[in-house]
Design a protein with these regions (language model features):
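Low-acidity, Ser/Thr- and Arg-rich intrinsically disordered low-complexity segments
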Residues: 5-15, 22
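Short, charged helix-capping/linker segments at alpha-helix termini
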Residues: 83-91
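Active-site or metal-binding loop neighborhoods of secreted/extracellular toxin and effector enzymes
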Residues: 177-215
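Bacterial N-terminal signal peptides that target proteins for export
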Residues: 20-28
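Peptidoglycan-targeting cell-wall enzymes and recognition modules
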Residues: 52-81, 101-181
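Alpha-helical scaffolds flanking conserved acidic
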Residues: 90-97, 183-187
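Sec-dependent N-terminal signal peptides
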Residues: 27-35
Length: 215
């Protein structure tokens, strides 16, 4: 009976060896796969020396004219003009500011003669930032604010009307030009405002150019 026991033991050993070899093959295969995957995770020498181009998004920042030495009212009008028109020329902006200063000193609720009253209480002469005088232009301010819900006595409401008023819009293309002198821009300013007395509006305009910086 001894020989059969020896044969069974040998067969068991062979089976064990086969199992071990199978497990080793599987382990080696997994190791090779892992190494291959790891190698693929790193760039090649060619990729390192000549990396692919990467498109960097461009962030556009538009420069605007600021006037730190101006009053809050002047700064507001300057900002709104640049926000709602294409006026880029400092001289053009300064000309508009100079004319407003001559007309009202940027006091929105001023009636011609100096009285500070609401829109409905100015009975004679011009009113507001640019001294709207004719019945059509004066009523235009009130009608605009009634339609677009703004205060016709306020700086905000009057600035909106000033920019949107048809007579300003007709002259706007000239103000939106470039590299012209203040004297040049005074012509469309006259067509816009139709002043009777020129006063210091051109001098004021030159003063603004000295205070305005592009940032």
């Amino acid at each position: 009976m001894a020989p059969p026991s020896s044969i069974m033991a040998t067969s068991s050993d062979v089976t064990t060896v086969k199992i071990i070899l199978s497990m080793m093959k599987r382990t080696l295969a997994l190791t090779a796969l892992t190494l291959t995957s790891s190698a693929c995770a790193y760039p090649s020498i060619t990729e390192i020396s000549d990396p692919p181009a990467v498109e960097v998004p461009m962030i556009q920042y538009e420069l605007t004219w600021k006037c730190d030495d101006c009053t809050p009212e002047e700064q507001y009008v300057l900002e709104e003009l640049q926000k709602h028109t294409k006026i880029k020329d400092r001289n053009a902006l300064a000309t508009i500011l100079g004319n407003i200063k001559q007309e009202s000193k940027f006091i929105p609720n001023i009636c011609e003669g100096g009285a500070r009253v609401s829109y409905t209480e100015c009975k004679v002469g011009g009113y507001g930032l640019i001294q709207w005088t004719s019945i059509g232009r004066y009523k235009g301010l009130g009608n605009f604010c009634a339609k677009y819900v703004c205060d016709p006595s306020s700086l905000e409401g009057q600035t909106r009307w000033m920019i949107n008023e048809p007579i300003f819009q007709r002259n706007l293309p000239v103000f939106e030009g470039h590299d012209q002198s203040i004297s040049y821009y005074m012509k469309p300013a006259y067509y816009w405002l139709g002043w009777g007395i020129k006063g210091n509006r051109e001098i004021y305009a030159y003063d603004y150019t000295k205070k305005m910086v592009l940032v």
